[in-house]
Amino acid sequence: HLRNHFGSKPFKCGKCNYSCANKSMLNSHMKSHSNIYQYRCANCCYATKY
């Protein structure tokens, strides 16, 4: 919690310059580098990673 107050972002992406305060946000960010579209609409061709 204190990282939010001090602006510390120790979790860094190895593929770009993104950094964040907690590991769960980094895990979520890493999906942006993936080609896996986890959620697909059953009625059309729309798909998203998140």
Curated annotation (Swiss-Prot):
Its main location: nucleus. InterPro entries: Znf_C2H2_sf, Znf_C2H2_type. Keywords: Developmental protein, DNA-binding, Gap protein, Metal-binding, Nucleus, Repeat, Zinc, Zinc-finger. The keyword Plastid does not apply. GO terms for biological process: segmentation. It is found in: Nucleus. A zinc finger (C2H2-type) spans 1-5, 11-33, 39-50. PROSITE patterns: ZINC_FINGER_C2H2_1, ZINC_FINGER_C2H2_2. GO terms for cellular component: nucleus. The keyword DNA-binding applies. One of its GO terms (molecular function) is DNA binding. Gap class segmentation protein that controls development of head structures. Belongs to the hunchback C2H2-type zinc-finger protein family. This is Protein hunchback. The lineage of its organism: Eukaryota, Metazoa, Ecdysozoa, Arthropoda, Chelicerata. The gene is hb.
